[in-house]
């Protein structure tokens, strides 16, 4: 999604560890910025905007008709009813899930507010690539790795405090 209004998601690779500090941007994930669309707003060119896990993701496999389900315990790679894959198409659903949590916490959020909250609450990664345009955006990770807890918490706090309007990404 390179559209101005879309939230573009990059994929990270956890290097098969539980330690998020060693996560890297996946080699197949697009880097930014996107090509200038001549709209006069350099912030629109800062894509991707967020990153999320997208490498070696375990997924459920449909096995009712294939007969491959064996309900084995142990390594998920060998049980016949799960599979795995990698790609930004694996990273994007987790960000969609975060958006759902945010809307559960605060149904009054606008699409623009959701996008800004996700960017604001992201776990920052890498040095700012274009600090003259934005002090946090990085060409690999966007504004950072999506943080479901912080994004949902901010959504709830905005609802609880009856705050509306734009989120200031500089504070």
Predicted regions and their residues:
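Secreted peptidase-domain scaffold signal
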Residues: 137, 145-171
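Conserved active-site and cofactor/substrate-binding residues in soluble primary-metabolism enzymes
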Residues: 4, 23, 45, 90-93, ...
